């Protein structure tokens, strides 16, 4: 094959490769659909409704003997423990361990929301978006009571912190958690169901 002919064949191949690389670059750096919804880039937020969510931690998801025999239980990114889902919003338990290293009467639990937004619908957010990418964090607990195997347990859960973004954490009474044979349930308030549609 002559050199001139090789150049004619290579030039379109190089251009095609360049186009593919540029397309991959722009797709990779494109903001996620969640961010586009929150910034109202191609989407309009049509409503925000305050909601509450009952969070249940099934004991069968945890390792045997936890928390009595375990130092800590942490879910890695590939082992997130899904606690709740409505199809587009998912709540995961990320970590559950003794508070402050080894306080035997208090547990610390960390959760995060993860989203799979469709082209239109609603999401359950732990903050109120302002439509320009900012938000007001307002997550709270209206009651410190937990439900331990369908029985109320007073003063068993307290808010530990919120943020960044879709993360929040709570303190749990270790005795109440250990008393649960099936599940430990508490209610999180001041969540926001945000409805959106394409513009």
Give each language-model segment a name.
Residues 1-9:
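N-terminal Lys/Arg-rich, disordered targeting/topogenic segments
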């Amino acid at each position: 094959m002559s050199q001139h002919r090789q150049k004619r064949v290579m030039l379109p191949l190089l251009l095609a490769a360049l186009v593919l690389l540029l397309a991959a670059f722009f797709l990779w750096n494109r903001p996620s659909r969640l961010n586009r919804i929150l910034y109202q880039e191609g989407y309009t937020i049509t409503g925000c409704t305050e909601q509450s969510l009952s969070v249940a931690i099934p004991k069968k998801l945890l390792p045997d003997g936890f928390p009595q025999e375990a130092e800590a239980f942490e879910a890695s990114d590939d082992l997130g423990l899904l606690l709740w889902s409505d199809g587009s919003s998912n709540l995961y338990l990320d970590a559950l361990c003794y508070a402050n290293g080894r306080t035997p009467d208090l547990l610390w639990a960390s959760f995060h929301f993860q989203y799979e937004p469709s082209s239109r619908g609603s999401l359950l957010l732990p903050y109120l978006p302002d439509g320009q990418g900012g938000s007001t964090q307002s997550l709270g607990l209206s009651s410190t009571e937990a439900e331990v195997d369908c029985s109320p347990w007073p003063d068993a859960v307290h808010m530990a912190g919120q943020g960044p973004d879709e993360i929040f954490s709570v303190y749990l009474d270790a005795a109440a958690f250990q008393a649960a044979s099936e599940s430990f349930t508490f209610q999180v308030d001041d969540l926001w169901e945000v409805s959106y549609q394409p513009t």
